């Protein structure tokens, strides 16, 4: 009985603490642009807030636009950190953040070359909260894509600096 009471007490305290820190679930679209390089990234994201900071994780799908030189597609995941500049209680504030994106892109052509990519990204943006539960977050970032595997795409366009505009939207709990 004592263990059950202790379990219920700890569970109640943990749920109460989590209820004080909002979290968000939504979709995200990013469009990395670099010298000779264009890409599309769509994905799902989860973000948890603690006062003026937030931590996010996401799963992404990478695909090349129709007008790109070489075709590719692949999956990735990321983890990120954001810090808010404002203290607006409505949740609409500017932010600055860092994100680490790991992606496995499969380049198409005569042979399929699987490429593991690592991209550190710095971003700035604005987090808008509509009503109590809906959000949208436009942002722009700069990242440098680093290829971990040795194979290269035919024009070496898979490495280098990227300007990364993005937009996410979803539901706040």
Regions found by a protein language model. Give the residues of each.
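Cleavable N-terminal export/targeting peptides
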Residues: 1-22
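Short glycine/proline- and aromatic-enriched beta-strand/turn motifs that initiate or cap beta-hairpins
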Residues: 19-68, 168-173
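A short acidic/glycine-rich loop-to-helix N-cap element
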Residues: 147-158
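Extracytoplasmic loops and strand-loop junctions of Gram-negative outer membrane beta-barrel proteins
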Residues: 26-29, 106-108, 150-152
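Gram-negative (and chloroplast) outer-membrane scaffold detector with strong preference
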Residues: 45-136
């Amino acid at each position: 009985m004592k263990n059950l009471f202790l379990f219920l007490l700890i569970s109640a305290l943990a749920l109460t603490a989590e209820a004080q820190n909002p979290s968000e679930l939504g979709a995200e679209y990013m469009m990395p642009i670099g010298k000779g390089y264009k890409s599309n990234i769509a994905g799902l994201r989860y973000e948890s807030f603690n006062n003026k900071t937030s931590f996010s994780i996401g799963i992404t799908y990478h695909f090349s636009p129709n007008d790109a030189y070489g075709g590719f597609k692949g999956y990735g995941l990321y983890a990120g950190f954001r810090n808010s500049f404002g203290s607006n209680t409505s949740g609409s504030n500017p932010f600055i953040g860092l994100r680490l994106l790991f992606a496995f892109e499969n380049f198409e052509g005569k042979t399929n070359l699987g490429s593991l990519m690592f991209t550190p990204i710095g971003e700035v943006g604005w987090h808008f909260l509509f009503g109590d539960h809906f959000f949208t977050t436009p942002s722009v970032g700069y990242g440098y894509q680093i290829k971990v595997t040795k194979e290269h795409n035919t024009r070496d366009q898979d490495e280098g600096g990227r300007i990364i505009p993005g937009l996410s939207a979803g539901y706040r709990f």
